[in-house]
Amino acid sequence: MTVTLTANYKEVFKQETVDFIEENCIDGEYDLDDALKFIDEHSEEDFVTFYDAYISAGENIGYDVVDAFIEYHGDVSYVEHVEDAYRGVYSSAADFTEEFYNDVYGEVPSFLVVDWEATWQSSLRYDFDFVDGYVFSSSF
């Protein structure tokens, strides 16, 4: 159910949700339109339970990152793990793989030719998720 008028939320939502909105959006620092959008995309229960974590993670690592992680996992409850799981943004899984192995084992000598995409496929894809350019650890 889409809440089209911000004034009617008191008539539509449960008292617990209204109280959360009053405390955090009206008297607090959260934007009411953003909060209502979150409820539309998820649920009232998820709003009350996870919105603080969503805002915190979004401010720390970016809302696009958080939204991609939630969408990939299919449940907003995963928002509690996104900051621990996030490894960065990369143009490809191969770029992440190259950086990962260089960080762990040191620079690969320039005379060696490494197929980083094949290395991703055979090794790292089991431990990491590549989602819309974002890399997340799958062990969180």
Can you describe what each PLM-predicted range is?
Residues 1-140:
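Acidic interaction surfaces
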